């Protein structure tokens, strides 16, 4: 069985599969993904595979430069998105946006 290339919290699985979540915001440890990469996606909690995505774009962002567009791509409000990012990556400022589509 192949390992997963990237994981998401299980609570995001349905939004990813339905196309409501089309970006992920990660820290430097996951800044290596490039446009065109095809990734196996698993759940963070159990590493269970649930889809394959293609990276369509990458960019950098800070908490202060997050926009309503980012929030919409995450299927959240901007305050929700800022809180989620701050909770997952406390004390960090620089992040990497990975835009994707399900294959």
UniProtKB/Swiss-Prot annotation:
Active site per the UniProt annotation: 21 (proton acceptor), 24 (nucleophile), 74 (proton donor)
GO molecular function, one term: hydrolase activity, acting on carbon-nitrogen (but not peptide) bonds, in linear amidines
Domain ASCH: 6-101
A Pfam entry, by short name: ASCH
Biological function: Catalyzes the hydrolysis of N(4)-acetylcytidine (ac4C).
Family from the record: Belongs to the N(4)-acetylcytidine amidohydrolase family.
Name under which the protein is recorded: N(4)-acetylcytidine amidohydrolase
Species the sequence originates in: Escherichia coli (strain SMS-3-5 / SECEC)
